[in-house]
Every structure is written in C-alpha cells, then in structure tokens.
C-alpha cells in the first residue's frame, strides 16, 4: 500500500480546490453536532449545505464509530465521499482518532475503492501533532490490510483462490495536510511506513507455522535484514554457544533436533562513542513445555512463543528504514523446547554463562533460561539500556489480560520512558512490581536459584529471575504473553510491541 502527503489550501475547496481532486474516495471527519468546522465545513460550503442537511435530518449524526458513504456528490471530484463520525469535539482523544481511522477502513473495505484522499490526519487530538496523526493512520490502515496468505504464496489454499477476507483493494492513500505541516508529515510517512513494515515482519514471523519458522529461519531473516540495510550480523551456532558456556540456554535446546541459533544484529546510526540500546528477544520457535509437557489443547499457539524475537527484529528493521541517529543491537537466543530421551529433566541443575547455577524445577519455564544467558552476553556492549521482550508467563495474562504489556524495571526513568512511548503509540504497558522480597520464592536447596517460584506472583518472580542477570546495566523487561497474539476468530500475531519499542527509540534519538 502506497502512502503520500498532499499540502492543501483549505480556503480553496471547490473549483480547482482540493475537493476537485480525482480519487475513488474522499474521507472527511465530522464532529457530533451541527457546528461544522475545517474540512467538513469546506465540504458543506462546496456542496451547498449537504453535510448540514444530513446532520439536521438525522441521517448522519457524527457519533463515534458511525459513517455514511455518499456517491457522485455534485461539486466533488471523488467518486465517493465517506463521512466519518468523530464524536463530540470536547472528547476527541487518541482512542477516538484511532476509532475514526478503523471505521473509515472498514467502510472502504466494503467498496471497490483503490485510492483515497484522506482528510482525517490533519485533525489530530489535542496535544498530538501531525507527525503522530500520520504515523498512527499508516499503522492502523496497514494493520487492517494485513494478509499473511497474500504475503506468503507457499501458504495459499489448495484451490489457489484467496477467500473474500484475503482481498485487500485499497492501494493508494493520499494524506491531506496543512501546507505548514507538509515537511513534518512527509517525514512521518517514512516513519509510519517503517513501523508498519516492522509490524508486518513481526506478524509474519509469528504467524508462520513452526515447521517453517525455525531457529534457522529466524537467523536467515536477520541476515536478510542485514543485507538489505547494510547492517552487521553475527549468528552463533551450537559449538560457539558451548564455547561461551551458555549452559542455561543449551539446557533448553537438548530435546530438539533443530540447531539453536544466537543472533546478534547491529544498527550503528550514531558514532562509535555512543553506548547502544540493546533489545533482547525470546525466540522459542515452538514450546511444547519439554518434559513438563503442556496440555494438547491450544498447543498450536505455542508457535507464537518467539514473538519477542520477532518484535526485536521488526523493530531493528524499522529503525534502519527510518535512519535513526542512535546505536541499536538486537540479540535473539532461539531454539525449540521439545521432549525427548535426551531432554532436560525437572530437577536438573545447570550453570549459566554468568556462573550462577539454576535448578530447573519446570522445563516449561524455559524462556527465562535462554534469556538469562543472553542478558549476560550483552554486558560486553556496555549498553545505555537493555530491554528484553518475551512471551514469558501465563501469569501476566491473568494479571493484565490482553490490553497492557507487563513492564518491569529497576529505574523509574527507564520505566517512565517506556510507559510514555506506549501511551503515545497506543501500544500500552503497565508497570509491575520488582521488589526484592519476591526473590525469596526462587530459593533452591541445590543451586543458586530455582527457575520457578510457585503460583503466587508468577510473572513477578519470572522478572525477578531475569533481574539477577542484569545488575551491570539499566534494564527493563516486557512480558508480552497477553499482547503478542490473539486467539479465536481473530487468531494471529498482533505485531506488538513494535510500536512501543520504535517510539521509545525515536524519543531517545530526538
């Protein structure tokens, strides 16, 4: 899908003005009530009071979530005019803006329109600028148009014919902006497109079946990103992982015939003296639970257990496309967690790269076992900050559901930066406790720590486990178990937390 901007003179609406633009659909936002303003007023004047009459007659009221499509409107060059309800102007916030975009996309999807002049983005909520509006619009429109089957021909249905849901008709969107916002809007198109691309990569990797998206596939994806954007990439195999004494990571890999991979992808957008931000993503490409086997029902969704890895790769790709002036490193430990005659058993004790010993009481608590060695490895980069991303605990879903990502951090400053980025990108997180008292639950009679701490505060104790390996740098942990994918009729990867991470990095680069 192609996005561009067009600077328009709103004072010249009719003949030779923006309303004369030839396009399949003109998209205009209308606030609830009869006091028209902005583009809606210009449209009303050019159409001799059409919008006002519709409001007065009650055919369209401008309420949130509503829309009305008009065809062949006199005085308008577009084949269709789509009126989108914005709700009450006093209540127009980020969520109302997003709802208007989604409403417009749904309405357009029921037509054969392939192009649109989009007059919603120049009307952002208070305290938001044109850049935010453009990035948000592109992300939401692209999100609605995502189709895995079209992006991966090898997954097409046997008859070779896509279903109705696989058809995306909207191909070109021109975002109308004020002339004095043109420069900022153009930059925002680049950034919005990069973020959408990163989200789509993340969703692709998550949605692909685990017989395709293996650890080797993830490594090859990282190599492809590096080649396309001229980045540095290093992929360590089993022998190199063994040489680094990553005993915790290796313990998880023992049951699978798929070779483990340890991926390091570097984006150097600033000088060598700038300490990098490191993103660490959990890459379990399929999680059976190992010897502590999961129930069969719903196990197919454990292909999503690598969404942390997918999100950091998607984020790094987005950063490279945007050309941000900062240094970012993505680190991905990736393997399968499988049962077999040589798999790690409950009660086994292993030595991590840090030298700390771990009693593995439950082989299904494997994400923390691969992450802890990665978190030790990244000390060599002397990072400015480290953020790990993982579908780590079902307990986080119990605590927060599917709305907020769980956020853990020692530093209030780092936590606030991530929370603010989440609010701005509408990819929200909620800060969880990391008190030292929870560490007592990880005590072991046979090792420095156990890999589980019992049922109480399961997401917290998982974060406390990771905290033991992050004392040499500023660190945060994002538990995305509830936000990385959806189940049911809308089943599929969400692309989160790419918007949060990219906004966090854009803010640091500003």
Swiss-Prot record:
- Residues reported to bind Mn(2+) 1: 287, 364, 366
**InterPro entries recorded for this chain?**
Leucine_aapep/pepB, Macro_dom-like, Peptidase_M17_C, Peptidase_M17_leu_NH2_pept, Peptidase_M17_N
Arranged from A to Z, the UniProt key words for this protein are: Aminopeptidase, Cytoplasm, Hydrolase, Manganese, Metal-binding, Protease
The Enzyme Commission number assigned here is 3.4.11.1, 3.4.11.10
One of its GO biological process terms is:
proteolysis
Q: Does the keyword Manganese apply?
A: yes
PROSITE patterns on file: CYTOSOL_AP (PS00631)
Per its UniProt record, what CDD domains does this chain match? Peptidase_M17
- Quote the cellular component terms of the Gene Ontology held in the record: cytoplasm
List locations, semicolon-separated. Answer: Cytoplasm
UniProt remark on cofactor binding: Binds 2 manganese ions per subunit.
Coiled coil ranges? none
Name the protein family.
Answer: Belongs to the peptidase M17 family.
NCBIfam families, sorted:
PRK00913.1-2, PRK00913.1-4, PRK00913.2-4
Function, as annotated: Presumably involved in the processing and regular turnover of intracellular proteins. Catalyzes the removal of unsubstituted N-terminal amino acids from various peptides.
Tell me the protein's name: Probable cytosol aminopeptidase
Origin organism is Cupriavidus pinatubonensis (strain JMP 134 / LMG 1197)
